[in-house]
């Protein structure tokens, strides 16, 4: 009888053990700001062993990963990646957007104070983001035992990925030459951040965002967080969100690989060396099979039109300022009222001055229609679209769905200007070779997405996947609910690997 009871108990324990939710010790998200998908292969032969090559060779790559909304900019990209939602449901309409009579920054929060700095620029939180993130859902699923942190040089790149319930988010403040946070997360910096800042060799006033050493200081801070917080060693699944900002700033200044300088190559080879060191630290702390890692980008980047034209390729610039001045003059003439009909433009999103129109009893629908008619005459534009009528616009589905997915009423503009492929939204002068992003075309929307580590086998798919699929995929692998505002779907080739 005793043997029978023991056997039954053993079987019960075995069944319970096998039924336990299987999760990695740590989830790591790495976002490379303004990384084009083709950088993976353009720089492959120059990458060393153990870094980006390891990721490409050991990971599962979604080679047709696209951003499925506009605008393709940093704040929106980081919010969308981790919420699984575009601006239409997560509310982050751009880096900066208009709400009523004022412009706001996507992370501004005057109700909180900077911690580690007296700068007002550290008064930041994710309160404008209307969706939860991967980390929020992981925290909720573990009764808030999971630790979740975000780190980047750019504040929005640390804050938005980490989510609303994060244990901390740290970003770089050049005025103190170190990482800071806000009272949204904590009242004082942890001792390990204070120590890191004291040991930082970068001088006050120096901006690592514009230099390759910004990559190094970010990964070093990420490693410091990981070790001090014992991420992956707390008996539950933790999460670390890392974003590399220097790749974007340097590309804006000096361009993609197509531009004359070597700055783009320098920063991506620095990334390769530093990510190897970071992988080694992860392996040592939680084991190669102990963490689930994904690397992606918030958006890609367009080759400079000067470079394009030198090689007889398509590219150009749209002088938006001149266009809006001309359209304003045409509207003043048509409606017989002098004034400023547009009060803001953010990228390709144009905001009418609703207060001015109301004060002069001008019908907004009539003004929109007249403005669009004028914009359609501009040779650098394919067309212009009333955001609220985008669903019936005579445009390819590719463009139309991106306009719809990127529109949040009350934060986005009134009209979206559809620029030609590889066109900048300002007048590019001769001799300038920097890059930009923000538009609908594949140069800005085609980004890398590679998974590596826990429960991931090497491979790839060229099936179309979207940025908003990233969060549902990670959540499905973790067996937690997808974020609240999510509109994406799990990537079955990743989730269902056998």
Predicted regions and their residues:
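Secreted, luminal/periplasmic, and some membrane-associated catalytic domains
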Residues: 47, 64, 73, 95-123, ...
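Active-site regions of oxyanion-processing enzymes, predominantly non-cytosolic
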Residues: 139-140, 145-152, 158-161, 215-249, ...
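Non-catalytic, well-ordered alpha-helical segments in soluble enzyme domains
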Residues: 131-140, 347-385, 463-489, 496
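Bacterial Sec-dependent N-terminal signal peptides
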Residues: 1-23
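Active-site nucleophile/metal-coordination loop of metallo-enzymes that catalyze phosphate/sulfate
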Residues: 21-23, 41-132, 154-170
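Substrate-binding rim/cap in mid-to-C-terminal beta-strand-loop elements of soluble/periplasmic
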Residues: 322-361, 435-478, 492-498
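A contiguous, mid-domain pocket- or channel-lining segment that forms the substrate-recognition surface
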Residues: 117-206
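Active-site His/acidic residue clusters
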Residues: 159-170, 230-271, 307-309
């Amino acid at each position: 009888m005793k043997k029978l009871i023991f056997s039954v108990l053993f079987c019960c324990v075995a069944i319970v053990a096998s039924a336990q939710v299987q999760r990695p010790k740590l989830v790591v998200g790495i976002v490379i700001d303004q990384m084009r998908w083709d950088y993976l292969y353009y720089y492959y032969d120059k990458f060393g062993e153990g870094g980006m090559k390891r990721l490409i060779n050991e990971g599962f790559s979604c080679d047709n990963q696209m951003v499925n909304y506009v605008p393709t900019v940093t704040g929106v990209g980081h919010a969308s990646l981790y919420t699984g939602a575009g601006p239409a449901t997560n509310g982050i309409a751009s880096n900066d957007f208009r709400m009523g009579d004022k412009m706001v920054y996507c992370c501004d929060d005057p109700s909180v104070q900077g911690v580690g700095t007296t700068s007002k620029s550290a008064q930041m939180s994710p309160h404008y983001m209307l969706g939860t993130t991967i980390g929020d859902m992981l925290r909720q699923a573990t009764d808030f035992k999971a630790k979740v942190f975000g780190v980047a040089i750019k504040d929005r790149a640390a804050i938005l990925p980490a989510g609303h319930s994060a244990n901390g988010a740290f970003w770089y403040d050049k005025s103190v030459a170190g990482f800071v946070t806000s009272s949204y997360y904590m009242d004082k910096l942890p001792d390990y951040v204070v120590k890191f800042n004291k040991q930082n060799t970068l001088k006050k006033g120096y901006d690592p965002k514009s230099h390759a050493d910004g990559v190094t200081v970010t990964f070093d801070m990420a490693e410091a967080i990981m070790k001090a917080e014992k991420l992956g060693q707390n008996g539950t699944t933790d999460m670390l969100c890392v974003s590399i900002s220097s790749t974007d700033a340097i590309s804006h200044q000096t361009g993609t690989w197509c531009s004359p300088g070597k700055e783009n190559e320098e920063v991506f080879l620095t990334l390769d060396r530093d990510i190897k060191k970071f992988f080694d630290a992860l392996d040592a702390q939680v084991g190669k099979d102990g963490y689930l890692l994904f690397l992606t980008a918030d958006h890609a980047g367009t080759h400079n039109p000067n470079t394009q034209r030198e090689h007889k390729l398509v590219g150009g610039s749209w002088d938006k300022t001149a266009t809006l001045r001309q359209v304003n003059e045409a509207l003043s003439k048509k409606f017989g009222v002098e004034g400023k009909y547009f009060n803001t433009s953010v990228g390709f999103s144009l905001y009418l001055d609703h207060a001015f129109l109301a004060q002069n009893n001008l019908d907004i629908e009539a003004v929109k229609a007249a403005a669009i008619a004028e914009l359609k005459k501009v040779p650098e534009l394919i067309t212009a679209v009333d955001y609220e009528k985008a669903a019936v616009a005579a445009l390819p589905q590719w463009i139309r769905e991106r306009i719809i997915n990127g529109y949040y009423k009350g934060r986005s503009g009134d009209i979206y200007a559809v620029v030609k492929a590889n066109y900048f939204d300002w007048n590019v002068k001769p001799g300038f070779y920097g890059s930009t992003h923000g538009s609908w075309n594949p140069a800005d929307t085609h980004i890398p997405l590679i998974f590596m580590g826990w429960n991931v086998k090497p491979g790839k798919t060229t099936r179309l996947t979207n940025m908003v699929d990233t969060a549902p995929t990670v959540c499905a692998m973790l067996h937690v609910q997808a974020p609240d505002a999510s509109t994406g779907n799990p990537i079955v080739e990743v989730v269902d690997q056998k």
